[in-house]
Amino acid sequence: MKDHIAVMAGLGAATLIMAWLPSVSKKIKISYPILLLLIGAVLFYLGVPLLWPDPFWPDQWLLYISEAIVIISLMGAGLKIGKNYSIKDWKIPFRLILITMPLTMIAVYFLASEFLLMSIPASILLAAALAPTDPVLAAEVQINDASSDKNNAVEFSLTAEAGINDGLAFPFIFLAVLIADSKLELSHWFLDKFLLKIFIGCLIGYIIGTSVGYLIERLPRIRGISNPHGFVSLSITFMTYGIAELLHGYGFLAVFIAALSIRYREEVEGSIKEKMHDFVEEMEKLLLVIWILIFGGSLLNGILNIASWKGAVFAGIFVLVIRPVAGYLGLWKSNLNGIQKLAISFCGIRGIGSIFYLSWAFLQSDRFVEKNIIYSVAAFVILFSIVIHGLTVPWIMQRVNKD
């Protein structure tokens, strides 16, 4: 009977710690996801009765939780980006999307098929799920000053990349599912899952973002109607995502574009944008605490044992070789200096978004016989990313900001 009281106490203590954890991590130069991971492992070891995965949660649970965290973080990412960026500035994120992301997918596909001996659809699925950088765990390398109209190139590029690529990975998740179910018609996939759904997602995001921005700016002019509170950003997030998905678009893209449209609207008062961003950021942190604590417990509950040493080798190659090399090739001959190129290339953090894509695919098709191995490999990659990037990113960003 008292289990739920223990859960409340444990979550309360963990979220209370989160109030100071970012400041502490900045001081000791270790990213706070590492500290949360350790806390989660300790809570599991002590037997705190949370809903620990054994070693997996049901796909439906994983889908709903990761989906909520990702779309909230995408709204936050869009609201962070200042308005004083030219088409020239946006070339860097698009290089990462159009060059780095495909190169990453190709490398992961061959590593999965040749080293892990996975089937073609499983290799494509793993490649697509690991290709996007994570908008949630990558918060420390993204723009920190949401009130600024322009930030340094590294923060901007990583924030914009995380916002865009989460939607652009989806066509290849569809591709893996269609191949697994032997239903692939290449022309239909390209026209529908690639072109049409991306277009609809961007269009819905722009329409909702500009419309809501107009309302935020106009309604307070009517006597008796005050400026909206920060929680309106959460309302916009869920509304945009839901409408885009219902109208056959990619909701992730729609949410990010909606946030950008509001941020870019000159007439919307800056303080309102900051309130919206701050509320979303607090919600994101709360959900992030819960997710990492649970993930920390799952690591001790056997999720890594399934892929064994091969999963560890795969994760090491991915984090230390594939993303940095693909990232640097994508930025080749760009106008960034060497330190900026290295920082952007190395800081391709992976996380919760990958879990969403995998759980979504497994709910669409039961033909992925390597399901547990795929989850295990993804867990290795996320763990390696949290630890390696968590120990190095604070130092890298300090060096970048000095330059």
Residue map of PLM features:
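Transmembrane helical cores of multi-pass secondary ion antiporters/exchangers
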Residues: 1-403
